[in-house]
Amino acid sequence: MRLSRSHCRHPTFLAAVFVVVACAPPNEMAVDDRVEAVARGRADPRDDERSRAGEEPEIQRGRALVLTHACAACHSAVFDPAADGYLAGIRTVAEEITIEGFKTRPRNITPDNETGIGRFSERQIFNALRFGLRPGETPDVEITSNIPGKGNFPARPKYLAPPMPWPTWRHMADQDLWDIAAYLKRAVKPVKHRVADSEGPPDFWASHWTKRIGSHPAPSFPTANEVAGASGDDQVQRGRALVIHHACGDCHGGVDNPSADGWLVGARTETDTFQIGPLVTRARNLTPDLETGLGKFTERQIFNALRYGLSPSATPDVEITSMTPGSGNFPAQPRYLAPPMPWPAWRHMTDQQLRDVAAYLKRGLKPVKNKVIDSQHPPDFWASTYTIQAIGPYPASPFPTANEKVP
């Protein structure tokens, strides 16, 4: 899958520029055998600094999901970061996403009636998230089937443009998606900003979505290269849910050349690249293969990569207690993960969630040998103002952002 973007969406660099938000430990909960229920329980903001007094619980949960799933990475402007730019869509042609010849222009998802999603009901937004159906071309009805022409599913469906990750969200609980819809409709201020329509070949949807869905395993264990016995490990099961829901397979699944052992094995072909400005990124092999994957790294090194964006191959196996280079075991000259790795969005996740992800990658997958060519970027890429701008789409705690409503 070739995705080209002429700016850096994810601030996966310059960690010292911002402060990571400390997250309260999650409440204990029984592990449900339904993957989606596990992930939903771990995503709740609880009573930590992300919550706001007097706000409905569904909006708090919806905000947490919108933040940790990096919705702002596509749906917020970076080159023209206005105070009201959060979730208001792209502002320049440079922010287009190109996948296999299809030009996607992320939409304004604030509740503006004219240019955003204000004219759609929460049910229509839910249907968009659950089934990938464009809300403007789908009636406000309950859909009970995903087969065209049945159960109110449109006979000729019009789908949302990629990289909208709705195929991964088919494994999420309905309540999660209702919570996101509630947050977008009720907690975000409307911003009037019209985004041009996406453009692409007429047969794009059938070919692309068939491959995309193939990169996302079903909730039941195992896929071809998962460890069957790991389904009994509560921590691994929670981590698996998070990996699926956060669309890790979109980049690390090797979509251009899917095979029986292709889950999370990284880029397989030369076209499995992400072009972001001057950077060419190839998603790495995340299986625990000792030679070509994560096998030689500890769970703590993987955690440090997820929490701080530090390359595990250039970071020792130590506890890090500071975000300041040279302090608290943070490397004096840090080497960061290449975008579009969304770890900045994960600063709103708990440490336990990220440890769960690390456990799944180390203990829940079979090693698959697949050597990925190194990413390419100019020497001054990380330190440029080009990367500093990318911090804008991720609001910090406490809330609100400039264009969120205050209860």
Regions found by a protein language model. Give the residues of each.
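C-terminal motif of bacterial Sec signal peptides marking the signal peptidase cleavage site
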Residues: 19-22
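Short, cysteine/histidine-rich loop/knuckle motifs that typically chelate Zn2+
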Residues: 73, 250
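Hydrophobic alpha-helical positions that pack around
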Residues: 109, 286
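Bacterial N-terminal signal peptides that target proteins for export
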Residues: 1-13
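Flexible coil segments in periplasmic/lumen-exposed cytochrome c-class electron-transfer proteins
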Residues: 32-51, 76-104, 134-234, 240, ...
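Bacterial signal peptide processing site
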Residues: 24-26
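Aromatic- and charge-enriched surface segment that lines or borders ligand/interaction sites
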Residues: 116-133, 293-310
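Local sequence-structure signature of Cys/Sec-based thiol-disulfide redox active-site neighborhoods
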Residues: 60-69, 240-246
